[in-house]
Amino acid sequence: GAAPNQQAIPAVDYLMNDIGAQRWVLAGTDYVYPRTTNKILEAYLKAKGVKNEDIMISYTPFGHSDWQSIVSDIKKFGSAGKKTAVVSTVNGDANVPFYKELGNQGISAEDIPVIAFSVGEEELSGFDTAPLVGHLAAWNYFMSVDAEVNDEFIDGWLDFIDDDDRVSNDPMEAHYIGFKMWVEAVTKAGTTDSNAVQDAIIGVAVPNLSGGIATMMPNHHITKPVLIGEIQSDGQFDIVWQSSGSVPGDAWSDFLPGSKDITADWQAPLACGNYNVKTGQCSGQNYE
């Protein structure tokens, strides 16, 4: 999956620079990924000059269905005269009642746009997309990408599954890239031994489905393009923004005190996933 600098940070930049957002709702499901992402985004927004009173943070349990009071709070928060946007790390089936309640309370994508990190083609498949049309999602791949390699992949996938209604999505592309990288690394190493493949995979480059190249970095993150899509009535995405090139994944965020001095480099002699550049020590799971 994407590192925060390959999804969450560019999404905020888009909302800030292209949409003009000045007030921010960070809404997430109550578990580690949304909480960590929102800590990063809160710090990032404050570094951009956003004040505490212009940031609202909300967490709900998995499967949350009663969004009336929270959406009412979002609506009130967005009525202060500043352009407001929602950055959503809400996961799973809680998304459906969330977007429905936005519509019930008359909140359109033009009023308060929502950008999501867990709503893709598969999640939109098979249900009424009307409440979601115009809202946004940030991914590293969309089925609607205009690239010959993507068209060939989709044709092959639909032929294989024998169902023209099926969709492709970002996690599928990640598997596509990952398997091709593994094959290249095995070929390079001359063995399937996991340690040898781990060493060989750094620097491996394979085509992605957007017409570019994915490269495995020394920190075991790959380079990815960043795409922002607007939800359409057919459950597909109209790509409204994309990065000028591929973005290298940052294993440790520069916007958290506990990680800004940490780097990852799995090449010898360092071979460390959490190396503190100030202390010169490798810690955590690599501590010896």
Predicted features, each with a name:
Residues 187-207:
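Polar, surface-exposed loop/tail segments
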Residues 101-176, 186-192, 243-274, 283-284:
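Extracellular/periplasmic periplasmic-binding protein-like sensory domains
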Residues 20-27, 79-84, 136-139, 159-166, ...:
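Flexible glycine/proline-enriched surface loops and loop-helix/loop-strand junctions
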Residues 10, 109, 223-226:
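Extracytoplasmic
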Residues 1-105, 144-152:
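Extracellular/periplasmic Venus flytrap/periplasmic-binding protein
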Residues 40, 177-181:
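Short amphipathic alpha-helical face segments that pack within enzyme cores
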Residues 205-288:
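Solvent-exposed, acidic/polar segments of extracytosolic/periplasmic ligand-binding ectodomains
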Residues 26-29, 164-173, 193-197, 213-216:
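Surface-exposed patches in mature extracellular/periplasmic domains of secreted proteins
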